[in-house]
Structures are given as C-alpha cells and as structure tokens.
Amino acid sequence: MDEVKKLTIKDIRRMYEEKEPMSWISIYDYPMAYYADQAGIDVIFVGDSSTTTVLGYPNTLYASMDQMIMFAEAVTRAVKHAFVIGDLPYRSYQASVM
C-alpha cells in the first residue's frame, strides 16, 4: 500500500502558486473527517460555525476556545493526508478593546 503524504503549508502554497486545484471542506467531527480524508480532500476547515451546526446555538458568538480545540482535535485525529485549519472564536485574537 502506498504511504499517504501529509499535506503541509508549503504544499498548499505550492498548489496555490501552480494553480493546482484544491478541495476544501468544513468538518467538525472524527467520522466525517475520516471519510473526507479517505476521499482525498486536501484541506479541512474546522470553523466556529460548529457552534450553530453541531451545538445548536443561534450564532457563532457562543464559540469558546475549548470548544474549538475539541472540534479541531477530533478532526486531526482522523486525518492522515488533509491539511487542517482551526478557526479561532470571535474576539479570541483581539489584543485590546478600543
């Protein structure tokens, strides 16, 4: 069986620069990430929209860092090829409140 190569940010950059088609999808759990990876998806985005689509909140403002880490960990445990991007919750990256 061929060894599966894990995509890196350098691979994504090269694919972009060479205009090579890439497949992206938003996924929040282990089973879906496993099947997406098996299907050859290149990039899996773990978005804060998981709070609305999975947890049933009315908007993404309810996303916490702990929740986003939990979703990202579940996805990364499932994949061997895809590059995983984890979203940050709203305002978790803001340095000040001007």
Predicted regions and their residues:
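N-terminal amphipathic alpha-helix/helix-capping segment at the start of soluble metabolic enzymes
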Residues: 1-26
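Alpha-helix-loop-beta-strand connector modules within alpha/beta enzyme cores
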Residues: 2, 6-10, 57-90
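Intrinsic-disorder/low-complexity, polar/charged segments
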Residues: 8, 95-96
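Short coil/turn connectors at secondary-structure junctions
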Residues: 19-22, 39-42, 79-82
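Hydrophobic faces of well-ordered beta-strands that scaffold small-molecule active sites
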Residues: 23-27, 44-46, 84-88
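Conserved, mostly hydrophobic/aromatic
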Residues: 25, 29, 36, 75
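Glycine-rich, proline-tolerant flexible connector loops at the mouths of alpha/beta enzymes
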Residues: 32-33, 39, 43-69, 88-95
